[in-house]
Structure formats: structure tokens, C-alpha cells
UniProtKB/Swiss-Prot annotation:
Similarity comment: family membership: Belongs to the scytalone dehydratase family.
Organism of derivation: Metarhizium anisopliae (strain ARSEF 549)
Gene3D superfamilies registered for this protein in UniProt: 3.10.450.50
Pfam families xref list: Scytalone_dh (PF02982)
Name of the molecule in the record: Scytalone dehydratase-like protein Arp1
Keywords, sorted A to Z: Lyase
Length: 190
């Protein structure tokens, strides 16, 4: 009996079609050059650099946002405008004293349909909070190690970011104190 060195491609049990994405879609979704216009790279760069206008440009009109595994809410169809308001808020990623870098590790892609893909990503998000917007003195650090499902939809031939579902594996330092809106006054003093 001979074994094939080519791994089997997963198929949908109902339709028999492949769940694999095309090579071109793989390139489009995961290109890592700084000048690209693709959602995975732009998502991490725009959040890390608080580049809100360019982040907004890669969003689908409605996003599935599921923060239930990190103790927050779930939205089945959050508008892009509401998503932008949430992430750019001073109590979250818009705080001028918070700097982040989101690094993506291993990734695999799952095709849901011709126009929908789920990216399964390992993620390390480093955060530093400074005492003031001049970014001279570090107040605290907090880093998160997680896996994320990122959702993408293809519209007009272009992939758009359509949501996320993070699951934190573990945090370092004082992650729970990084975002002003992430914990209550009573938790601050406990």
C-alpha cells in the first residue's frame, strides 16, 4: 500500500466542494508587504498605528464581532461605522497613550463560499500604555496571546474585513489595565 505525500483537501460534507481557498485568494488575503492593500496586513497595521481612515476603507458594511470569549458582547451585524466608533474610542484602541503591535503567527484559511473566508490566526498583541501622549514614559505593559477567527467577504473583487472572534490563551503583565474601558473602578482597586 502506498501513501500519497499530498494531504487531502477538506471538503464540505453537504456539497462535496472544497473548503480550500484558491492560491490567488491566499496571496490576496495574506500578503505581508507594507505597501499592500490587503485586509489581513492592513487590519493589523491600521490598528497598531491608529490609522483609522485606512482601517475604515477595508471594512465590510456589517461586521460579526464576537467578544464573548473575552467577557464582552457579541454583535451579529455591527455596522462599520459602529465598529470604527468602538475601536477608535479613547477607552479602547484610540487612546493616544496606548501603543500596540499585532503580530500574526500561524494561519490557515477556510473557504465558506466563493465570497466568504474565515482566517484562523495565532496572534500576539503587545501593548504599552504611556503616562502622556508624548510617549516618553511607560506606565504599564500588557500583552495578549490569542487565536482569532477573522471573517472576510469579497465585494467587487476585493476582500474586506467582516469581523472577528478572539479567544485569549493567556496574558502577560497588566493587560487588564491597558484599556480604560476594559475594567471597572472596583476592579482597579481590588
Amino acid at each position: 500500500m502506498t501513501q500519497s505525500s499530498t494531504p487531502a483537501v477538506e471538503t464540505d460534507s453537504k456539497t462535496g466542494s472544497s473548503k480550500a481557498i484558491s492560491f490567488q485568494d491566499y496571496l490576496d488575503l495574506s500578503k505581508q508587504a507594507f505597501h499592500n492593500q490587503q485586509p489581513l496586513h492592513l487590519l493589523t497595521q491600521r490598528i497598531s498605528f491608529q490609522d483609522w481612515a485606512r482601517l475604515r476603507a477595508i471594512l465590510a458594511p456589517a461586521l460579526y464581532v464576537d467578544y464573548t470569549k473575552i467577557g464582552k458582547e457579541k454583535w451579529d451585524a455591527m455596522s462599520a461605522d459602529d465598529f470604527m466608533a468602538m475601536v477608535s474610542n479613547d477607552d479602547f484602541l484610540g487612546d493616544p497613550c496606548v501603543k500596540t503591535q499585532h503580530l500574526i503567527g500561524a494561519t490557515y484559511w477556510e473557504r465558506v463560499s466563493e465570497s466568504k473566508v474565515i482566517g484562523h490566526h495565532q496572534l500576539r498583541a503587545a501593548h504599552q500604555v504611556y503616562t502622556s501622549p508624548d510617549l516618553k514614559t511607560v506606565k504599564l505593559r500588557g500583552h495578549s496571546h490569542a487565536t482569532n477567527e477573522h471573517y472576510y467577504v469579497k465585494s467587487g473583487g476585493v476582500w474586506k474585513f467582516a469581523g472577528l472572534k478572539p479567544e485569549v490563551r493567556w496574558n502577560e503583565y497588566k493587560f487588564e489595565e491597558v484599556f480604560k474601558g476594559s475594567y471597572t473602578q472596583s476592579e482597579k482597586h481590588s
